[in-house]
Amino acid sequence: MYTYMEYLQKCLYKSTNWNEDNIYSNITATSQALLDFPIPNGFKIDSSSKTTDYSASSFTLSNHHQINGSLAYLYSSIPLTNTMGTKDVSLQDAIAGFRIIEPSVGLRSKLKNNIMSNRSSLLYGRMYFPGSALEAMIIKRLTKNSQLLIKCVNNPHLEKNGTMIVYLQNNTAKYSRELIYSTNEALIGLRCLYNLGDATSHNFTNINPAVIPKFDNSVVSIGTEIWYAARTMSPGLSAALRYSTRSTSTGKPLTMTLAINPIVGHVSSTYTVKTSVASTFCSKYDFNVFSYASNLSLGFELYSYANKKKNSFPSFEHHEIHSSSEENKYLKKHPELQRHHNLHHNLHHQRVPIKSHKYEGNRTIINPIQNLDNVYHINPTLLSSNGSTSTTTNNENTNTSETVTAAFQNLVNESDFSSVFKFSTSLNDKVVKILWEGRLKEFLVSTGVKLSLNPITNTPEFNKLGISFSYAL
């Protein structure tokens, strides 16, 4: 779960069209959110308030071994009008989870229409007690596509009582670059991320639409980082690849990543898929080419819908569903798109009707499998030599695929979830992490446990156990 200050920072990025997913450090953010999520330790309560549209404050009190806390302030040069308190904020915005990577053409259009982000800035500071530890952060937008990020920590337990990290970031639709300097060991780093291909360059005019693969909105990103510590003369190097796509038949996204560190010989691959609107599955495999050590990690998250009044939640009982449930719901809200859907439906062969299965508690679960089509979905009736017919059908298929993709994404964004259950395990480390996060009255609650197996007695041990309450106006 994000802290309130982290949430405000993300709201600033959204309002100024700064794409966090285009930064190299976030290339594996989806798998980290499902496998490496933090577990609260002890008892913690966080009370925050946005006094104006430009400023906010937060007070944190925790009890782990001893009573400690912190006091934080934040100031933004532009009004943060797109923020909400813990009572009204959606869990999708308050909790780290699956990230839907948008194609570069969509990012370009958003950045092009940006007006307010040229000179925006954010100031943040936090003081910890007991003790004299301080931390601060400055975000200054230099141009539409570049910004300066400075992070500082002052702690008497650190060398020279603190450290400072400076990021000079350039973020465009096609690529992103970061120049980093840290006072800790005089560390200098360079990060680059490049998005391969361009959605506008895909030209299917001369290809029959019946044999176009049923996947669209794919993004391939490749990046690398190079580090050099001048004080210890130690180098660092890593590279990563990310492939993200969405099925045009169901609209469900998936993301695959591959990360390599050639110096230590570490290779890591992840596969994450959003199996339904309310569930996500992730797997990760680590391997070391020098020691031949390997590890398999598995994790998932499952959202629960908020309790609704009778007949307020859409029920598909006693109805036949020929398309995906997400597509049907989206078309009901947008009747103007129904014509494209009906025309596409008549051109293709009839799909097998799928009955819904109703659970207790007025919850309806739709079978995610529509039919047993081939991946390329070849229909002999569409193999026409007429060029005009082929072009018309191509436009209809494109409109329908975009409708299904947008339907699933809008259904995820508009769903009212009350809680999320996360689970992850590692076979080699023999660690199990369980986390529950949800809304309780006007509070956001996070509670979980981390279990490990004692290597000597082979008995489970509690490594972490705690609960956290967050409240924000």
UniProtKB/Swiss-Prot annotation:
Membrane topology term: Multi-pass membrane protein
Entry keyword annotation includes Transmembrane: yes
Domain of life of the native organism: Eukaryota
GO biological process: establishment of mitochondrion localization; mitochondrial genome maintenance; mitochondrial outer membrane translocase complex assembly; mitochondrion-endoplasmic reticulum membrane tethering; phospholipid transport; protein insertion into mitochondrial outer membrane
A GO CC term attached to the entry: ERMES complex
Record keywords: Membrane, Mitochondrion, Mitochondrion outer membrane, Transmembrane, Transmembrane beta strand
Localization, UniProt: Mitochondrion outer membrane
Subunit structure: Component of the ER-mitochondria encounter structure (ERMES) or MDM complex, composed of MMM1, MDM10, MDM12 and MDM34. Associates with the mitochondrial outer membrane sorting assembly machinery SAM(core) complex.
Family: Belongs to the MDM10 family.
Function: Component of the ERMES/MDM complex, which serves as a molecular tether to connect the endoplasmic reticulum and mitochondria. Components of this complex are involved in the control of mitochondrial shape and protein biogenesis and may function in phospholipid exchange. MDM10 is involved in the late assembly steps of the general translocase of the mitochondrial outer membrane (TOM complex). Functions in the TOM40-specific route of the assembly of outer membrane beta-barrel proteins, including the association of TOM40 with the receptor TOM22 and small TOM proteins.
HAMAP family for this protein: Mdm10 (MF_03102)
Comment on protein domains: Lacks alpha-helical transmembrane segments, suggesting that it resides in the membrane via beta-sheet conformations similar to those predicted for other outer membrane proteins and porin.
Protein name: Mitochondrial distribution and morphology protein 10
